[in-house]
């Protein structure tokens, strides 16, 4: 994750109902423990840090967000989870062109940014939370002091997943949330439409890193990598890719 637009009064609404047990029946009914291990089978390999990411941590974190992976019909739910893991797998990838099992079998290899860009607020966790103001926003929403304790994101796997799902679920005006885009809860404005910003996986890429990857008239290597992971997970979940999976013709939001 490269940049978040500031939020006014960012607040995470965590429902008391539908906690971890509810998510075990919801998200866990699509991403079983066996599926999780198959999706991210190389995360614990030599050279990777990803054994840090566990299925139990994912399910526990998802329990704080009752709408995550549970909105809409079965097809929509599967596509959202494929999209979430597609984007976060790119952010944490350890893959290369000739990697065993292919380049898109190496998601969740990294916990920390390879070359820290803004110490101590460099990229951490599945969404690679970066920069002090993003740690502040996420911490305020989650009830954690991430400004003074940024390493919580790389030392507690539940916190790591919570920051990623929080980002996924949270709109950053004028950007919608990735969740609303993928679950068809977002209606593009006139400006969005004239800028080519339409519902689909490509819009999630635009939200996360549009300034660097979108609106160039061609797909960057990073954008292609995001799509490659997404397609792999859609295939594993037996769901179609949907429309507008690329963002090459989408104008990014101001400042990316």
From Swiss-Prot:
Cystine pairings recorded for this chain: 48-109, 214-247
Family per record: Belongs to the glycosyl hydrolase 19 family. Chitinase class II subfamily.
Keywords attached to this entry: Carbohydrate metabolism, Disulfide bond, Glycosidase, Hydrolase, Polysaccharide degradation, Signal
GO biological process, one term: chitin catabolic process
Catalytic residues, chain numbering: 91
Distribution of this protein across tissues and organs: Expressed in leaves and at lower levels in roots, sheaths and meristems.
CDD domains: chitinase_GH19 (cd00325)
GO molecular function, one term: endochitinase activity
Originating gene: Cht11
Signal peptide: 1-22
Keyword Disulfide bond belongs to the record: yes
EC annotation from Swiss-Prot or TrEMBL: 3.2.1.14
Reactions that this protein is recorded to catalyse: Random endo-hydrolysis of N-acetyl-beta-D-glucosaminide (1->4)-beta-linkages in chitin and chitodextrins
Classification via InterPro entries: Glyco_hydro_19, Glyco_hydro_19_cat, Lysozyme-like_dom_sf
The protein, known as: Chitinase 11
